[in-house]
Regions:
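Glycine-rich cofactor/substrate-binding loops
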Residues: 90-265
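Internal glycine-rich alpha/beta core junctions
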Residues: 1-121
Length: 265
């Protein structure tokens, strides 16, 4: 909405055509009240700050995830040397500094958002000089946050992915138990609740066997105990827990199948 004509917050005695100036300047129309846009001079900055803070939250989540996956314990990705720095004393260190800075900038964005909200919480009706500082804060926020987008883009572009390690991790810790349960429901008729209880039992039995995925023997035992007359083979049980098979079957919109990921990109 067009604030032109509000003056210092109480309008003017000049006979202005506020609708005309709104049309000429490309606004949808003038503000209905002249006091509101002057009192609320902090609102546009705060709305932008909120959007930037949420964007930074997403980037920080990505940064945190990449840092974790790049550790020796996970070893799923390796950051490019461009995005790492050494230690002040430890020769072997590869500190993920670019990602850590993104996390720090996210905290800064949160602080700026809170500052803007506080600036608007105790104003008098009309003009307040307090809101002059909201202009400086929002410019600082944008300047500090803007580089994070290009940095994260480059991190992803240069990231080395350890597919072998990822596949190994995906095949462990019962990652295919859910897809196995869903397959059982489709083979039924078998209620989802019942199938879940069967697979839960099978997981416990498989854990006792020292397995990282549901074994054919444990699932057969669970089916027998739960009196579920479902015909399965060892091949079925193994096939439905393979990561490649799971991704191939996860084909609805927005899912992580290869086809859908390419569509999103």
């Amino acid at each position: 909405k067009n604030p032109l004509g509000a003056a210092a917050g109480y309008g003017t005695t000049f006979n202005l055509d506020r609708q005309l100036t709104s049309t000429l300047l490309g606004f949808d129309g003038p503000t209905e009240n002249v006091t509101d846009p002057i009192t609320q001079r902090w609102e546009p900055e705060t709305e932008l700050a909120y959007d930037v803070a949420v964007m930074m939250d997403h980037l920080s989540t990505m940064a945190q995830t990449f840092i974790l996956l790049s550790t020796r314990e996970f070893n799923m990705v390796r950051l490019n040397d461009r995005h790492c720095t050494g230690s002040s004393i430890m020769p072997q260190k590869r500190n993920p500094c670019s990602l850590e800075v993104i996390k720090a900038k996210t905290s800064f964005a949160h602080g700026m958002l809170v500052s803007l909200l506080f600036a608007g919480k105790s104003l008098f009706m009309g003009y307040n000089r307090d809101t002059q500082w909201t202009k400086y804060w929002i410019m600082d926020l944008v300047d500090e946050s803007k580089p994070a987008l290009s940095v994260m883009t480059e991190v992803i572009r240069l990231l080395q992915v350890n597919k072998t390690q990822m596949l190994k991790q995906a095949e462990e810790e019962f990652g295919g138990a859910t897809s196995l349960m869903e397959w059982m429901v489709r083979q039924g008729p078998l209620p989802l609740r019942k199938a879940k209880m069967v697979v839960e039992k099978a997981v416990k039995y498989s854990e006792k066997e020292g397995k990282g995925k549901v074994s054919y023997q444990s699932l057969k035992k669970a089916l027998t105990e739960m009196k579920v007359p479902l015909s399965i083979t060892k091949k079925n049980v193994e096939e439905m827990q393979r990561p490649e098979k799971i991704l191939a079957q996860t084909s609805s919109m927005g899912t992580p199948s290869e086809k859908r990921i390419k569509e999103n990109i």
